[in-house]
């Protein structure tokens, strides 16, 4: 069965894999095919497969073992995930959520460059100064504060509320937490340099550069998360995780075209 519905593909793929497991196509103790083969068979991206496998792992059907692959450990769900209607951003796949942030926050940064004040710039510079003193960059409060302050620089508090909610609700997202279990605790996600590029564009009040810098920052985050978990899932990352129809074409950045 080839999956053609473009909406929430990883959920459809997870349902198909669960059906195969429950019907005995894959038995307890078996390994699922490598992700690249599932992606080719279903004609979907590897990030869709990654999110589907994470969903199966959260529900207790499979266990992803470092250097060994994806093992079937149960033919029935061990853990049921109930959607929390009060946490609308806590129920999405991690790469789906990052893609949404990339689309929204790159446009927020573009608009912020047209509205930013001297006070906004001073606050962003102070945040960066504090962030430089961090011992560990991952899950830093200063990372969150920078993104919120960029949104506040639009002079639209509703945009800042959206950014904050998308960020903070990750801690309630079982798929986001499961993905991070596969990341080495020693991994450093050095986002400070990316933030510097965003800040420089805002100082220049350059909307296009601000949009590109925010887009690239979240692209770097997606690539880091994908690459850092790939050893466990046994395949290499694509260069661009959501390459279809990108809002910003990074290859054209040097020419300044949109």
From Swiss-Prot:
Alphabetical list of CDD domains matching this protein: WHTH_GntR
InterPro entries, A to Z: GntR_C, TF_FadR/GntR_C, Tscrpt_reg_HTH_GntR, WH-like_DNA-bd_sf, WH_DNA-bd_sf
Keyword Glycoprotein in record: no
Pfam families assigned: FCD, GntR
Portion annotated as DNA-binding: 35-54
Gene Ontology molecular function, alphabetical: DNA binding; DNA-binding transcription factor activity
Gene3D superfamilies: GntR ligand-binding domain-like, Winged helix-like DNA-binding domain superfamily/Winged helix DNA-binding domain
Protein's UniProt keywords contain Transcription regulation: yes
Keywords: DNA-binding, Repressor, Transcription, Transcription regulation
Coiled coil: none
HTH gntR-type domain ranges (all copies): 7-75
GO BP, one annotated term: negative regulation of DNA-templated transcription
Function: Repressor for the exu regulon that encode genes involved in hexuronate utilization. It regulates the ExuT, UxaCA and UxuRAB operons. Binds D-tagaturonate and D-fructuronate as inducers.
Protein name from the UniProt record: Exu regulon transcriptional regulator
Organism, scientific name: Escherichia coli (strain K12)
């Amino acid at each position: 069965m080839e999956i053609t519905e473009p909406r929430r593909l990883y959920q459809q793929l997870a349902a198909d894999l669960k059906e195969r497991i429950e019907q005995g196509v894959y038995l307890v103790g078996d390994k699922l095919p490598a992700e690249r083969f599932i992606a080719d068979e279903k004609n979907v991206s590897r990030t869709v497969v990654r999110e589907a496998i994470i969903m199966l792992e959260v529900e207790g059907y499979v266990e992803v073992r470092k250097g060994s692959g994806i093992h079937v450990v149960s033919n029935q769900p061990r853990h049921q995930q109930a959607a929390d209607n009060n946490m609308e951003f806590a129920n999405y796949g991690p790469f789906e959520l990052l893609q949404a942030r990339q689309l929204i926050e790159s446009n927020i940064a573009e608009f912020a460059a047209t509205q930013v004040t001297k006070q906004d710039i001073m606050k962003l510079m102070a945040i960066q100064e504090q962030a430089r003193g961090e011992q560990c960059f991952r899950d830093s409060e200063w990372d969150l504060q920078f993104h919120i302050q960029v949104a506040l620089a639009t002079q639209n508090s509703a945009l800042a509320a959206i950014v904050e909610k998308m960020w903070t609700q990750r801690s309630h997202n079982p798929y986001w937490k499961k993905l991070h279990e596969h990341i080495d605790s020693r991994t450093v996600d050095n986002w400070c340099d990316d933030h510097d590029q965003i800040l420089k564009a805002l100082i220049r009040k350059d909307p296009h550069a601000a949009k590109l810098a925010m887009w690239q920052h979240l692209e770097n985050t997606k690539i880091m998360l994908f690459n850092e978990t790939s050893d466990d899932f046994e395949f290499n990352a694509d260069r661009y995780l959501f390459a279809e129809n990108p809002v910003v074409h990074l290859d054209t950045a040097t020419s300044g075209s949109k």
